[in-house]
Curated annotation (Swiss-Prot):
Membrane-crossing segments per the record: 1-21, 43-63, 65-85, 93-113
GO cellular component assignments: plasma membrane
Stated name of the protein: Probable 4-amino-4-deoxy-L-arabinose-phosphoundecaprenol flippase subunit ArnE
NCBIfam families attached to this UniProt entry: PRK15051.1 (NF011625)
Topology class, membrane: Multi-pass membrane protein
GO molecular function (one): carbohydrate derivative transmembrane transporter activity
Length: 115
């Protein structure tokens, strides 16, 4: 079962990476027209690769864990993307936002404890 949870973390990292690549692709539209297309396509290709790998690993997760446990654990994506957006893109986050992230992490912790 621990392997299943480690794979869920890998899925989260891959899909988070894919989301960050999509953000970079969107930002690349601000580049000069002569380089915009190439840069955007590279970021989008990397996003598709990461998201595709994430889906392949996710299928493996579904063989190992019940969906009712695996899917909520993907909420880790909210945490990872929030942290990455803050530090990589300097996006503002409020205290309320961080309380939400902490609530998600607490929920993941509560679900991982065996009764």
């Amino acid at each position: 079962m621990i392997v299943g949870y480690l794979l869920v973390v890998l899925v989260s990292l891959l899909t988070c990476g894919g989301q960050l690549c999509q953000k970079q692709a969107a930002l690349s539209w601000q580049l000069p027209p002569e380089v915009r297309r190439g840069v955007t396509l590279r970021w989008l290709a990397l996003a598709v690769l990461l998201l595709g790998l994430g889906m392949a690993v996710w299928l493996n997760v579904l063989q190992r864990l019940p969906l009712s446990l695996a899917y909520p654990t993907l909420s880790l994506n909210f945490v990872l993307v929030t942290l990455a957006a803050r530090w990589l893109f300097n996006e503002p986050t409020t205290a309320r936002h961080w309380y939400g992230v902490a609530s998600i992490m607490l929920g993941i912790l509560l679900m991982s404890i065996n009764p």
